[in-house]
Amino acid sequence: MSRYIGPRLRIIRRIGKLRGFTRKKPFRRSFRGRGALQGKVIPPGQHGLTKLFKSRPFDSNESDYLIRLKVKQRLRYNYGITEKQLVKYVRQAKKMKESTGQVLLQLLEMRLDNIVFRLNMAPTICAARQLISHGHIHVNSKKVNIASYMCKPKDVISVSMKQSSLKLVNRNLQEYSQKMSAYKKRLERTLAYVLFQRNISPNMANALEYINQGKVQVNNRKVLLPNYLCHSKDMISVKTDKGIRKFQFSE
């Protein structure tokens, strides 16, 4: 089966972030100026910056065909399938009585390489396909080296008992747990989570409403970003229905 070996960062700059395609992030290809385009990813090519300025921040000037083409390309690159394979899955989905789009996603999600990726045994679907092709994955105690193998309910997916297989999968699982712990620590410092944790708002939706309405100040400055990272000794004041509540944030 053919696989994509070209530049991956260029693809995600064009059609958006794809978790199953690559771990790369276009940090150096984002607009560093001020305004509504700050932080936006610059499209690839010589005239990428010109295309970014032509795009409107709250309205799309893309045609319907271009929107559907991008969605199709996202499916192809994310799941690592060819155009011929995608057409085959679409034809299978059309034969079902249920919604074609929902059945198509179910067929793609039941592929063995995708399930190995969802189990966090590999960082990307491409890496999961490599694990399968090298014989590290077993299905129902039998070695399967076909990445497009369609799994069924109650199938048991396990790792080969070889030392190299266990070492490789354990390393990927440890990297995933470290990444999740870092995300959790970062989430605990966000302004919306701090308001919810201090019982100022009953839920996250109410905390977001306080922030969007401009009722939250940090160090006597109004903050409108829910993902604002609080630092230790920051003074946070919230204007609620029962009055103004102030507290000091501590990690």
From Swiss-Prot:
UniProt entry tagged with the keyword Nuclease: no
Record-level Gene Ontology MF annotations: rRNA binding; structural constituent of ribosome
InterPro entries: Ribosomal_uS4 (IPR022801), Ribosomal_uS4_bac-type (IPR005709), Ribosomal_uS4_CS (IPR018079), Ribosomal_uS4_N (IPR001912), S4_RNA-bd (IPR002942), S4_RNA-bd_sf (IPR036986)
Keywords: Chloroplast, Plastid, Repeat, Ribonucleoprotein, Ribosomal protein, RNA-binding, rRNA-binding
Compartment list: Plastid, Chloroplast
Domain S4 RNA-binding residue range list: 110-170, 189-251
An example Gene Ontology biological process: translation
Signal peptide (UniProt feature, chain positions): none
Cellular component annotations (GO), alphabetically ordered: chloroplast; small ribosomal subunit
Entries under SMART domains matching the protein: Ribosomal_S4, S4
Database matches in PROSITE patterns: RIBOSOMAL_S4 (PS00632), S4 (PS50889)
PANTHER family attached to this UniProt entry: 30S 40S RIBOSOMAL PROTEIN, SMALL RIBOSOMAL SUBUNIT PROTEIN US4M
Known partners and oligomeric status: Part of the 30S ribosomal subunit. Contacts protein S5. The interaction surface between S4 and S5 is involved in control of translational fidelity.
Function text: One of the primary rRNA binding proteins, it binds directly to 16S rRNA where it nucleates assembly of the body of the 30S subunit. With S5 and S12 plays an important role in translational accuracy.
Family: Belongs to the universal ribosomal protein uS4 family.
Name used for this protein in its record: Small ribosomal subunit protein uS4c
Origin organism lineage: Eukaryota, Viridiplantae, Chlorophyta, core chlorophytes, Chlorophyceae
